[in-house]
Amino acid sequence: MAEPIIMAFICYQCGYGAADLAGTSRMQYPASVRPIRVPCTGKFLYYLRIKGIPKGADAVFVAGCKPNECAFETGNFSVEERVKMTKQILDEMGIGGDRIEMFFMSGADAGKFTEAVNEMTDRAKKLGPNPLKK
């Protein structure tokens, strides 16, 4: 079985720093992750409409700033609610709400980024391929 495709919507301020540090530190994680840098995770719902699970990703995660550290003040809190809502919708559609998750991290949390990738890869393997995948 091929590695599942994981889309990671990562905040430019925090999540991207963690992903970059993981790469420069040569930390190991599956190469099937597709990082997508966004200005703020608060814009997540817009990006999910055009990418991610509707386009066939097996799992999606959002890597945003830690609570009270968002450069845009409330972006990470608003996306947390959107992720919860999206989980519920995916469950109702029979796709599986566990295909999406929110992780909070700082730019120095390279280990947390690799843990998020590994966790979502394991989840996607357990859930099987995205039923919307063409």
Swiss-Prot record:
One of its GO terms (molecular function) is metal ion binding. Its cofactor is [2Fe-2S] cluster. Belongs to the MvhD/VhuD family. Its EC number is 1.12.99.-. This is F420-non-reducing hydrogenase vhu iron-sulfur subunit D. The F420-non-reducing hydrogenase vhu is composed of four subunits; VhuA, VhuD, VhuG and VhuU. Keywords: 2Fe-2S, Electron transport, Iron, Iron-sulfur, Metal-binding, Oxidoreductase, Transport. The keyword Electron transport applies. InterPro entries: MvhD/FlpD (IPR003813). Transmembrane segments: none annotated. It comes from the Archaea. The keyword Methyltransferase does not apply. It is an enzyme of class 1 (oxidoreductase). Binds 1 [2Fe-2S] cluster. The lineage of its organism: Archaea, Methanobacteriati, Methanobacteriota, Methanomada group, Methanococci.
